[in-house]
Amino acid sequence: ASIRHELHRSRKSIQIRGLDRASPVCRRIKRLFRPGTIACMSSYLAPPVSVVIPVRNEERYLEESVAGVLNQGYPGPMEIILAIAPSTDRTAEIAQDLAVRDDRIRVIDNPDGTTPKALNLGVAVSQYDIIVRVDAHGELGPEYIATAVELLERTGAANVGGIMDAKGRTPFEQAVAVAYTSKLGLGNSAFHQGDAPEGPAETVFLGVFRKADLEAVGGFCPEFDRAQDWELNYRLRQSGREVWFSPNLRVTYRPRSTVKALAKQFFRTGQWRREVMRRHRDSVSLRYVAAPIAVTGITAGTILGLIGVVHAAKGT
């Protein structure tokens, strides 16, 4: 006889009634949420998560990024904390409108304007024990949060993360996206290449953390305007905690849209990675110098390309 079952979803829980423990649905839930602890004849409450998004001048992508979080369909309590830095566009207005439309969204001020301050402020006001870092310039892949929670539970890691999947919309952004995935562009980190197997890593893109582990090492260093993820992951590993990479975690990242914006981003990232190397000498890696090398290459390539266009126009 066929098994009759009902799947009741609400914002806070999944209730599974009459399900065979060997059924595909039950096996899927066991894999995603605390394997071995779910009785499929009763209700299950997925671990609650706090999503923290630093935001500054992101009117172009903010709504899309938040929608990507809300559309995850995560079967547990979730809050989204938008830490808004002083912006020159409609970012603050868009953020407030999003909060009015969905009570899971909270808006806090980040008067200092830096990313580490935004992240620390978000963690400080968060209600839950799992912190999901999201970039307003990015879009989470399907089941990203559920998969990350399962990885935290299964591996015992302090931080889990995956692939930065750069995708551009304009021809320039598309060219930059290709450079991002090149070993000559941003080094051969697993989260740029996506060809590494799951396992321990030096660092990962963004990250899903245990709040207790973040607090134990002092959170994000507020002095690192850039490269704060590299520096934090170094301290997590030095404390005996584990950073875990999985290619099953994928985030679409939108590159900067102009040469000027891209060069500024890479130049500042290169400066701060040098500071990581200065403070933590045993973290030195060729990957840290990939960003300034990439800036030089992109700038030189752009200049040569413009020279070629001019010569072609003149017929020389």
Spell out what each predicted region is.
Residues 131:
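Short aromatic/hydrophobic "clamp" motif used to bind/position activated sugar donors
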Residues 47-50, 79, 231:
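Cell-envelope/extracellular polymer assembly enzymes that use nucleotide-activated donors
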Residues 221-284:
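Catalytic donor/gating beta->alpha subdomain of glycosyltransferases that bind UDP-sugars
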Residues 162-168, 177-206, 215, 274, ...:
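Short, flexible, basic/aromatic active-site loop/helix in glycosyltransferases
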Residues 67-77:
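Short, acidic, metal-binding catalytic loop of nucleotide-sugar glycosyltransferases
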Residues 84-93, 112, 135-138:
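A conserved acidic beta->alpha catalytic loop
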Residues 143-174, 178, 250, 254:
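Conserved donor NDP-sugar-binding/catalytic core segment of glycosyltransferases
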